[in-house]
């Protein structure tokens, strides 16, 4: 494995690890469970995610990355150690790593990412803004002299960028993403149906029937939770329109941020490239 390059996505929702020549070798929820008494790591990734809302007082389930930045360096280090061991048995093995980070984070936050990754046996760490990584992953040719807009909806952050000639011309981010949409659905279910649901149920509903605008053919989904009035198990059938209504205010915030980034792209800049802006 010596000399192998890797790419890491330290997402608020998922941890992804790409190894050159092998492809994506890890794609799991970026969650870790810790025993409070012994400070021992109990589970990482999918196993830890399944413990959300089901653990005892002793076990704490934590997301080491929130809002696109590392919120717990110790647990992020434990997560990195866990996954890097999956691809090698040596602590000193990979000279280079590329790590995707939100475009709007501070220099201090960028340094924290570099330090966390470098502490796990990687000699050289390069950071790449999320919109650039997303564009390359989507197969966009960002070397061409026209603008391409990329919107990356993460769990904690929506990252927006306009790319041209191998650089990020204009960017912006907003702390609204999948986690906020889930919370919107949780609040909506409680407010409208007196139904208490958890994060995993909200996530499933969002993925199944969530929409930013009304669908031509309305879809339905069954929410299962607990009746707030009597504490008994309950279920309610909701439509895609209702889930869209629940998320509407947050979706509008993202749209407004996209508009502000577009407005920051000067007409002169576009004319200089003799082309139009492609979304």
Predicted regions and their residues:
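Nucleotide/phosphate-binding catalytic cleft detector across ATP-hydrolyzing
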Residues: 1-155, 161-271, 276-277
């Amino acid at each position: 494995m010596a000399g192998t390059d890797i790419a890491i996505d330290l997402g608020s929702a998922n941890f992804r690890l790409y190894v050159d020549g092998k492809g994506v070798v890890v794609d799991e929820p970026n969650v870790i469970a810790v025993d409070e008494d012994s400070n021992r790591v109990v589970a990482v990734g999918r196993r830890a995610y399944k413990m959300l809302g089901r653990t005892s007082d002793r076990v704490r389930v934590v997301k080491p990355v929130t809002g696109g930045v590392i919120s717990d360096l110790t647990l992020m280090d434990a997560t990195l150690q866990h996954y890097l061991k999956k691809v090698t048995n040596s602590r000193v093995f990979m000279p280079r790593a590329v790590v995707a980070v939100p475009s709007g984070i501070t220099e201090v936050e960028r340094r924290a990412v570099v330090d966390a990754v470098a502490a796990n046996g990687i000699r050289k760490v390069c950071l790449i803004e999320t919109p650039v990584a997303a564009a390359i992953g989507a197969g966009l040719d960002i070397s061409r002299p026209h603008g391409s807009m990329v919107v990356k909806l993460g769990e904690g952050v929506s990252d927006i960028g306009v790319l041209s000639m191998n650089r990020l011309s204009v960017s912006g981010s907003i702390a609204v993403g999948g986690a906020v949409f889930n919370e919107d659905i949780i609040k909506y279910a409680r407010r409208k149906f007196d139904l208490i649901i958890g994060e995993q149920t909200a996530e499933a509903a969002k993925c199944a029937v969530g929409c930013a605008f009304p669908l031509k053919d309305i879809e339905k989904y069954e929410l299962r939770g607990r009746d707030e009035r009597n504490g008994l198990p309950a279920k309610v059938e909701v439509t895609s329109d209702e889930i869209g209504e629940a998320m509407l205010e947050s979706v509008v915030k993202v749209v407004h941020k996209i508009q502000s980034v577009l407005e920051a792209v000067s007409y002169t800049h576009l004319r200089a490239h003799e082309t139009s802006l492609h979304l």
